[in-house]
A protein has these predicted regions:
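A structural signal for short, well-ordered beta-strand segments and their strand-loop junctions
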Residues: 20-23, 79-87, 129-134
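Active-site and ligand/interface coordination hotspots across diverse enzymes
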Residues: 1-58, 115-123, 143-149, 168-174
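Short, solvent-exposed loop/turn segments at secondary-structure junctions
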Residues: 27-31, 89-93, 135-140, 155-158
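Bulky hydrophobic/aromatic packing residues
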Residues: 24-25, 61-70, 77, 137-146
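Polar/charged alpha-helical tracts
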Residues: 43, 67, 71-75, 81, ...
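C-terminal capping/extension of enzyme domains
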Residues: 102-117, 136-174
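Noncatalytic linker/hinge segments flanking ATPase motor cores
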Residues: 58-73, 126-131, 170-174
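Internal catalytic-core helix/loop-beta-alpha segment
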Residues: 63-124
Length: 174
């Protein structure tokens, strides 16, 4: 595999057909130049990597970032297979401030966002709860989120506080 930051991309994880929860993220983190350290790279080596449709159960085996989410899911009797996670930008960056302007995106990235916006709108229409872990980009792209009654905008800065917000939100809506 050559050093190309655009190889290991992630559109979304989880249940694309009938989720009980949608989580909005900004993009996969970590340094794309050091792709050997990415959980996606290990999945790639083991033949389990997918840019979309990857089960959260599989993703969690390779990335402990999800452990806190899984603990919350268990506490509210939500299966990981009931969750859909949408990425705004499908490429890894060290920081979300490094996401380029939309006019500099690849066609793949533009198509991924378009697909994810359609999925989000579809599930909002079906009154599925949406948790905005990172949501500011999403509100610009899907303005009806602002008035969606089952949308929670995380105001916390740190992950452990965001996880507490997720737990409280799920207790209220599930």
């Amino acid at each position: 595999m050559q050093r190309n930051p655009y190889i290991l991309r992630v559109k979304r994880y989880g249940n694309e057909k009938n989720p009980k929860l949608v989580i909005l993220l900004c993009n996969p983190g970590d340094d794309p130049i050091k792709y050997e350290r990415l959980p996606d790279y290990i999945m790639y080596l083991k033949g389990e990597y997918k840019d979309a449709g990857l089960s959260l159960d599989v993703g969690c085996r390779y990335n402990d970032w999800w452990d806190d989410f899984f603990n919350v899911f268990k506490q509210v009797n939500l299966k990981p297979s009931d969750v859909l996670v949408l990425e705004y930008y499908p490429y890894h960056t060290c920081d979300m401030s490094l996401i380029p302007n939309y006019n500099q995106w690849t066609d793949y990235a533009k198509n991924a966002l378009s697909e994810n916006k359609k999925l989000l709108s579809k599930f909002m229409y079906k009154n599925i709860p949406v948790f905005g872990y990172y949501y500011s980009h999403w509100i610009r792209e899907v303005p009806q989120l602002k008035d969606y009654k089952l949308f929670y905008k995380s105001r916390a800065r740190f992950k452990n506080h965001k996880i507490k917000e997720l737990h409280q939100f799920l207790q209220e809506v599930l």
